[in-house]
Amino acid sequence: LGTGSLGLVAGAFAGFMIFSSICPCELMPGGVLFGETVDTPVANWNNTTANQENLCQLQIWAGIRPHSINLNCMATPEGELFLSCSVCDRKYWAARVEMDEEAVIRLGDLLYPVLLNRETDPVAMDRSFRARVNKLQYTDLETMVTPRPPLDQERFDHWWTFRVTSRT
């Protein structure tokens, strides 16, 4: 590589790292998530801030680059963690999640290495959806991106959920 090409690569890398430190933001995906990595396995996600966060951040790998997004996550009373995804068949990130997909969840300033699996069991999906409805009753209205659902809201047919398990 010549000096000009090396400078271009270095500039692109620096730009991507700056972009990653700012996003994901609102609807724009980001790159690498930064924070302190939690090395201890999480058995009960109620012992984290999952249900206190308006939005969680998820980082997956899309080919050779990191791809991060904001989305709803919720811990069930049993301590399971799930991700919420409406109209998920059209979401870029969801199409890239395979069985036991390695990912990172950021809750506050903490990074949790996790595995993702799409949940298809109707009983588990209903349990996850109930946790979503309950969490959204207490979400800050000023920063809320999902409308507050009624407590008796039924699970939507277009709604997917992903089970999150600790991989450390």
Predicted regions and their residues:
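A short linear-motif detector with a strong N-terminal bias
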Residues: 35-37, 51-53, 61, 82-85, ...
